[in-house]
Structures are given as structure tokens and as C-alpha cells.
Amino acid sequence: MSRFSGALQLTDLDDFITPSQECIKPVTIDKTKSKTGAKITVQEDGYYEESEESGKQKLQKVEITLQDCLACSGCITSAEGVLITQQSQEELLKVLRENQKLKATGDNDLVQTIVFTISMQPILSLAHRYQLSVEETARHLSGYFRNLGADYVLCTKVADDLALIECRQEFVERFRDKEDLTMLSSSCPGWVCYAEKTHGNFILPYIATTRSPQQIMGVLVKHFLAEKFNVPGSRIYHATVMPCYDKKLEASREDFYSEVNGSRDVDCVITSIEVEQMLMEDERSLSQHEPVDLDWPWTDQRPESMIWAHEATMSGGYAEHIFKYAAKELFSEDTDNELKFKQLRNRDFREISLEKDDKTVLKFAIANGFRNIQNLVQKLKRGKGANYHFVEVMACPSGCINGGAQVRPTTGQHVRELTQQLEELYKKLPISQPDNSHTKAIYGDFLDGAHTDKSHDLLHTSYHAVEKLNTALNIKW
């Protein structure tokens, strides 16, 4: 287990963001009048019972929800070991079965519209696992989810594009306002959760307010598509397929609960590993499911392909895209060629600069993995981080392509080797540019234009420092 420093307690945290095995959330115990002679009995099936002279009563089971995880300063990253009842493949399959029954019995007033959104990283992971092309994998996944009961299966392309546009505009506005704070990317929930719980009010002003592609997709599905399909957002069930467990926590944030719809923008998150498990339980390979094209409900004109890559990194391409945009917008410098990032401590910490008139006018960095994040935060605390104007921050080494819930390497294969193979698959994909007719149409048809109050309200969020718990339960002896 890797640790940041002796002053920090990190619960079973290592650089690969595996779920914490211990929960240190204190349970509130209601004090009652002292009683004697009581006996607690545990039955074989796990039933707890307290017996006393006045009779027997079943004891309440301690439950921990995802909201508890977000409000607790104990763990830092994901918490698979707790009772994640609303964010599992079991819950997803239950919802799908119940919806199929409602359709069969004609209870149309209760039937939900089921929408799946698949992120690019799980598509790559499952393509490698089942030895299919990336395009074939996307189509087979679409067919598989439709067979389970999905009405629409989407990719995250349009949300990825909107996230880049919003984030680059936010950076340019901060730069022009002469804010001294380094802007840190916000799409990684593991990083955001760590920042809120460990560094709180110090670090939060640095973080971009742009929502992650998953949560932008949630807004588009529950609001834009709800209007387009004439279906209440409350009757849309939105499931996403993501590369890490922390996306489950992100979807459970109260910031992403819609009072209008009475539901979360993303109802359920499953991961690459969970999709693999579902396929194994069906005893059918992914390739055995009928291929079906992904849906494109956003505009009348369907793009030639919905499987695209972004420049430079497998985590959205924030650093490279925003660097190129800012160089042109702020300094009239064209940087159309592929950028050459300089490796620093390791391959997960890189930087790039723009020089003009013998002066460094832009300096960006990419910091992947908690070791590099810790070094970055310490620089900011010492006042040395201002050298960077923007940093793309991802909790996992190598970024989202190596997410903690991606399909595991085969026996004898090293994680680094698998990651390199996934990177090669990614590099073969066509490059997507966010400025296209589809994003322009969404801004015009749904968001009242770019950089409007509505677009800011729906595509941005806020963060909350989590007060540290003073409990002896998180002390290691």
C-alpha cells in the first residue's frame, strides 16, 4: 500500500484505486434507558434478534449508502465493500426485468424508457477482452443491452465534446480575468472526491466547474431527450457503462439530483468488469449477441461514425485541446501539429509550454495517479504550482484507459502491457473535434446558445469540502 505521508490516513489506498476494504463511518447509536438481562441472538440466516423480559425485537441492520460515502471523510476513493444497492448489475437487471413485465401486462403509465450510455474506455477494454474491433464491440454491446430491454443505446461522444468546449471556455475566462489559480480538470470523480475530503476549501477553487461527460450526458438524457421524446424525465431510467467504480459515487452526488424530475441524472452506473460478469453469467460471448447500431437522437444528420478518439490522452484530451485553443484564442498562435509533452518524474507526469517573445505564456501539465496528484497538491500549497496554468488530473495511472474497473489482465499479463495494448487501439481511431454541427445544434436547440446562463446551470457544478470525522475508528494500531 502506498501512502502520501505519515500525517495522512489513507484507507487501503494504492495507485490503482481498488475499492476500500474497510469502512470507518461511525454509526450513530441512540441511547436508551439502561436495561439488564437482554440477550442478542444471531440466527443461521443472519437474522439479529434481541431478547429481554418485555419480549423480542428484530435489531435494525446497519446500512451504508453511497451518499454516506460522499459525506464521510474516511475513505478517499471508491467503496465497493459497502452496500451499493442502487449501483450494481443486480439492481440494473432487476429494473430491466420489472420494466419488461410492465410492458407485457400493458401498464404503460408505469413503463420507463431505458437509456444506456457507453463510455469509450469500456468499449476498448471489452474489445480487447473479446478480440473484436472497437466498432464491432460497440455494435455488439448495443445489441446486448437492447436484448436486455434498453430502448436506446448511446455513446458519450456529444457529451465529451461539450465538456471540452465548456472547459476550454472556462479556462480562457479565468485567464483573462487574471486569476492566479492554476485550473485543474474536473472530469475524474476519484480526484474530486479526494480533493473534497482531504484538502477541502484550499484546493476546491482550483478545480474547473465543468461537469464530467457522464454527468453532462445525464442532463442531456433526462432533460433534452425527455423534451424531444415527450417523456417525463422521471420516467427515463438512465444507466451508464464506465471504466471506474468512482463513477458510481459521482452519479450519487446530491448536486446531480434533479428536483424537477425527482430522480438522479444517472440512475445506475455499471463498469467494464460488471458487463464482463453479466456476459459470463449468460454463458454467451459478446460476439454471440446480434450487432445493432448505436442510436443518435441528437440531430437529424447521423455522423459517419460515433467511435472517436480525442487528442493526446485516453482521458478526454483536456490538456492538449485546451492548450491548442488557448494558444490560438489568447496569443494567436497556431499549434495544429501533435503536441510534444515533456516527461518529468515519470510517464504519468508530463508538461508542455508555449513560448512567445522569450517568455513562457502558457504552461500545462498532465498528472495521472495519486502519487503525482499528491506532489502537485504539495506544490500548490507551497505556492509553486502557479507555474502551471492548467493541469489535466486523473486518479488512475495512465488515466481512464486504466480505470480501476476495466477488465483485468489475463494470467501472466502485466497491467502496463494491457494498458499499452488499449492505447494502441485508441490511437487507431479517428480524431474528434468538438466544434461540429451536432454540438452547435444542441447549444442552439436546448441550451439557448453557447455560454448562456442555461448552459452554465446545466453543464457546470460545484464542490463541497467534507469535514473530517473525529473518530478513533480510522486509527491504525
Curated annotation (Swiss-Prot):
Any one GO MF term held by the record is: metal ion binding
Residues annotated for [4Fe-4S] cluster 2 binding in this entry = 188, 244, 396, 400
Q: Which organism is it from?
A: Drosophila willistoni (Fruit fly)
Name the SUPFAM superfamilies on file. Fe-only hydrogenase
Name the protein family: Belongs to the NARF family.
Q: Its function?
A: Component of the cytosolic iron-sulfur (Fe/S) protein assembly machinery. Required for maturation of extramitochondrial Fe/S proteins.
Key word Protein biosynthesis present: no
Q: Where is the signal peptide?
A: none
> What is the official name of this protein in its record?
Probable cytosolic Fe-S cluster assembly factor GK14772
Gene3D superfamilies according to UniProt? 3.40.50.1780, Fe-only Hydrogenase (Larger Subunit), Chain L, domain 3
Q: Which UniProt keywords apply?
A: 4Fe-4S, Iron, Iron-sulfur, Metal-binding
Any Pfam family the entry gives: Fe_hyd_lg_C
The entry's [4Fe-4S] cluster 1-binding residues are 23, 69, 72, 75
Instruction: Keyword check for 4Fe-4S, yes or no.
Output: yes
Q: Which GO biological process categories is it annotated with?
A: iron-sulfur cluster assembly
